[in-house]
Amino acid sequence: MAKLVGSIIDKVTGESVETKVQVLTAGGKFIHPNNAILKIGPGSPFFYSNGNFEIDVPRGKTRLTIERGTEYIPQNINVDVPAHGVVDLDINIERWSVLADQGWHPGNTHIHYDENEHRPDERLQLDPRIEDLRMTAVSILKRWDLEYAS
């Protein structure tokens, strides 16, 4: 196996950027760092990145998708990974709009946690930053007691 080392950088500021990352092997299998916080639930799998990640990757064509909120252009990258060694990736993501400059402030008033999550508090702290939200409200549902809180 080779090691894929990624650094995600804002193209304009040069600063490290927190993002969602999906890594698919040549066989289409989703892989992630061992200690990563993962998306739970339906939809495409991804892990949360603080701007840097390391993953052991099998040889072959590997596809990465990098996303950050609605103001950044998603990046799709294909990498031909060798059988051994280290593949360093500096991934620049570009902001296409600054909504706050136009009087808009992105938010989400209905963020859920999943009762199957192992680290919900960490994920709920990351989610608003990675989605580049200015305001959020977390909804908690005790499924069997039917109590609901925001």
Positions of predicted regions on the chain:
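A short, amphipathic beta-strand motif
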Residues: 2-11, 21-23, 62, 91
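Short, ordered, surface-exposed loop/turn motifs in non-cytosolic proteins
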Residues: 12-37
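A short, solvent-exposed beta-strand micro-motif common in secreted/extracellular proteins
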Residues: 21, 45, 59-69, 128
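Short, surface-exposed beta-strand/beta-hairpin micro-motifs centered on an aromatic residue
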Residues: 43-46, 50-57
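Short strand-edge motifs at loop-to-beta-strand transitions and within beta-strands
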Residues: 51-55, 77, 87-89
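A short, solvent-exposed loop/turn motif at the edges and junctions
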Residues: 52, 66-77
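Extracellular beta-sheet/turn segments enriched in Thr/Pro/Gly and aliphatic residues
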Residues: 79-99
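Catalytic cores of extracellular degradative/oxidative enzymes
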Residues: 102-150
